[in-house]
């Protein structure tokens, strides 16, 4: 049976249809908002997956180009691997949903969000997030806590829910909020140095709208939802857990209280070895339970240490940052480099400057755009002392790179101020938590070292949270390390400048965050950020005055847009000639802005002169130094500007009578000529005679003076 339900969000209809499409899926939901439509299919395996200690949830976000009436480019003509943006959207859908599944649920669950129609005013990723939650609620899968999602913009001090395409261009904030009826589950934001109080108010503004959407989903689930399948939860064998606990708890506690990471890990390895010797032969079919028992003890010790003893595993105060250091100009041949170290987390960032044309073109289901600033993040296995094959970037690396890019992008100078494409690569050399935020700091160092005139330096920090089972007690931690992230309840990343926030990413392992927790995390993050910025400023307090001698030189000029065709020439003949003769790269914008990228000053200036020549208007009455290109019986043809020739009639070659053109000029001679006429057909008539007379008159005037 087909069911249709709808509500209104920000003055537009949010509509769902369930039961018509995808009949063999557990739930296939067709959800629309304006003319944007996403088909969400959810399915789960009938039995739990054996031999794993995590919940196997898979979120896929698929963009179909037919959604915007496009045919894929390239030879194959079909969609390939997901774009980076699709991967980021899938990760964003995963984060608020995963904590709301029952603990111990081990069935494979797959959520596939296929974007099938898009209008640019209504974002498909926001619709997909709402659709994924609603589809899970309607299915037989044991998911019963709806999540509402909205985007929030900020224009002239006013918050806007789900801004349209035009409003998004004007907005200084791009905020996504996901929440249940009770608590915020996920936050993702990018902004132009948003003050902390304004950011908090924006989150709360979005939260109120999320509550309404979650309430709508709850009512739809109660009216149309399938009966939930019988819940099979993985539970550790109670007897084995008791035995392992009695044998090892004191050893685990002693090991976890060691403040040095390497010593603590070594001590825990010894504990695990003793437990293995004691129980592996006794319970050969329950090795997973034995490992889980050890994990639960570690988690209990760490959380009790923080909540009840008010201390952290490494001995720091709750608001204390690990030791910091910064360094620049590490690599002699790169355009800019920076090394940022926070405790055992260390990131080296390297900046490269290129021509405007080397920016990245973004062509997908949204309007085609390009970006000048790119950030890529690499997390090799050696950064955690492990051995793994080196592959291409995984979803986590793409996500962390995008977050650090979002944090820096609002601070990059405009194309007119700094006409370069910029790429920063952050290499994680050592990881003990918060590498994405260390990448923000490393990027700042590298950009300043490269001479990029950033608006202000930026830094990032990760805040953590530990709560009691009843959520009554909670402690917020500044600058979480790996152990606190692993056993904690929240990863609250905040990046920005001394003026305000440029990026936030928040996810949680519990059923949401209290408003007080969000406010305190944002406030404490600012204090930590200012401390880090002080360290960065002590290392390099302003951009280098000049770019590296190894960086390309960029020259700019403006030409009349109507002359662009003259500079390019038929089939690109003219512009290719300039490139061949000078070895430069040339980018011309529709408004007539010209960017010339050269390896040295001389070739850049030569290219500018040639472009100026091709784009200049020939004017009557002006005198030019031209080159004779051809001789005829009736006169000489002279090139006065690149690609622009005129005729000097034999009668105009000299002040005295000329019988033969060759008596006065030869091909290749440079002569002064005056433009006497541009006829109705655009032909240019020149006179050497008039140019000579003008020159003599000017000399006479100078003599009189």
Swiss-Prot record:
It is found in: Cytoplasm. It comes from the Bacteria. PROSITE patterns: KH_TYPE_1, S1. InterPro entries: ExoRNase_PH_dom1 (IPR001247), ExoRNase_PH_dom2 (IPR015847), ExoRNase_PH_dom2_sf (IPR036345), KH_dom (IPR004087), KH_dom_type_1 (IPR004088), KH_dom_type_1_sf (IPR036612), NA-bd_OB-fold (IPR012340), PNPase (IPR012162). GO terms for cellular component: cytosol. GO terms for biological process: mRNA catabolic process; RNA processing. Belongs to the polyribonucleotide nucleotidyltransferase family. This is Polyribonucleotide nucleotidyltransferase.
């Amino acid at each position: 049976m087909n069911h249709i339900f709808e509500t209104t969000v920000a003055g537009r209809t949010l509509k769902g249809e369930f039961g018509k499409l995808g009949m063999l899926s557990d739930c296939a939901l067709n959800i629309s908002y304006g003319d944007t439509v996403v088909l969400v299919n959810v399915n789960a395996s009938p039995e739990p997956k054996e031999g794993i200690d995590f919940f196997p949830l898979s979120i896929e976000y698929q963009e179909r180009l037919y959604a915007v009436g496009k045919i894929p480019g390239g030879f194959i003509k079909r969609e390939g691997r997901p774009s980076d943006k699709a991967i980021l959207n899938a990760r964003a859908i995963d984060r608020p949903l995963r904590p709301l599944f029952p603990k111990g649920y081990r069935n494979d669950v797959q959520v596939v969000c296929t974007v099938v129609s898009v209008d640019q005013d209504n974002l498909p990723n926001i619709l997909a997030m709402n659709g994924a939650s609603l589809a899970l609620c309607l299915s037989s899968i044991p998911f019963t806590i709806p999540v509402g999602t909205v985007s929030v913009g900020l224009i002239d001090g006013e918050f806007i829910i789900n801004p349209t395409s035009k409003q998004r261009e004007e907005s200084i904030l791009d905020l996504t909020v996901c929440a249940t009826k009770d608590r915020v589950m996920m936050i993702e934001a990018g902004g132009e140095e948003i003050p902390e109080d304004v950011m908090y108010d924006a989150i709360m503004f979005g939260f109120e709208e999320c509550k309404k959407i979650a309430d709508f989903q709850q009512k739809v689930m109660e009216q149309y939802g399938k009966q939930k399948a019988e819940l099979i939860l993985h539970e550790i064998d109670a007897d084995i857990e008791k035995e392992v606990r009695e044998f090892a708890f004191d050893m685990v506690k002693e090991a976890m209280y060691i403040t040095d990471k390497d010593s603590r890990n070594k001590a825990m390895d010894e504990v695990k070895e003793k437990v293995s010797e004691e129980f592996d032969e006794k319970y050969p079919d329950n090795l997973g339970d034995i490992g889980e028992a050890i994990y639960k003890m570690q988690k209990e010790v760490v959380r009790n240490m923080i909540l009840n003893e008010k201390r952290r595993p490494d001995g720091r105060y709750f608001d204390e940052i690990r030791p910091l250091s910064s360094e620049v100009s590490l690599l002699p041949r790169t355009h800019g480099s920076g090394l940022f170290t926070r405790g055992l987390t260390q990131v080296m960032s390297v900046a490269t400057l290129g021509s405007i044309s080397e920016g990245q073109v973004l062509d997908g289901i949204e309007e085609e755009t390009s970006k000048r600033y790119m950030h890529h993040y690499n997390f090799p296995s050696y950064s955690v002392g492990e051995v793994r094959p080196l592959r291409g970037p995984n979803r986590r690396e793409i996500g962390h790179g995008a977050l650090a890019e979002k944090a820096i992008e609002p601070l990059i100078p405009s194309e007119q101020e700094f006409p370069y494409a910029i790429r920063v690569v952050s290499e994680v050399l050592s990881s003990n938590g918060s590498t994405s935020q260390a990448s923000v700091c490393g990027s700042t160092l590298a950009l300043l070292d490269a001479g990029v005139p950033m608006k202000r330096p930026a830094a990032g920090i990760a805040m953590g949270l530990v709560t009691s089972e009843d959520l009554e007690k909670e402690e917020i931690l500044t600058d979480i390390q790996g152990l606190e992230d692993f056993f904690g309840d929240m990863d609250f990343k905040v990046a920005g400048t001394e003026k305000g926030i440029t990026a936030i990413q928040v996810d949680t392992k519990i059923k949401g965050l209290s408003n007080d927790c969000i406010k305190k995390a944002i406030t404490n993050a600012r204090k930590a950020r200012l401390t880090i910025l002080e360290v960065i400023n002590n290392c390099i307090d302003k951009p280098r005055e000049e770019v590296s001698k190894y960086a390309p030189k960029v020259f700019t000029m403006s030409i009349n847009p109507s002359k662009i065709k003259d500079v390019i020439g038929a089939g690109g003949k003219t512009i290719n000639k300039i490139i061949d003769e000078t070895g430069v790269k040339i980018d011309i914008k529709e408004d007539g802005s010209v960017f010339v990228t050269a390896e040295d000053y001389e070739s850049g200036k030569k290219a500018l002169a040639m472009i100026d020549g091709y784009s200049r208007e020939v004017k009557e009455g002006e005198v030019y130094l031209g080159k004779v290109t051809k001789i005829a019986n009736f006169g000489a043809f002279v090139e006065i500007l690149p690609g622009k020739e005129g005729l000097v009639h034999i009668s105009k070659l000299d002040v005295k009578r000329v019988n033969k053109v060759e008596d006065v000029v030869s091909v290749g001679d440079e002569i002064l000529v005056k433009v006497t006429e541009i006829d109705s057909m655009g032909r240019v008539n020149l006179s050497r005679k008039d140019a000579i007379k003008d020159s003599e008159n000017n000399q006479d005037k100078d003599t009189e003076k």
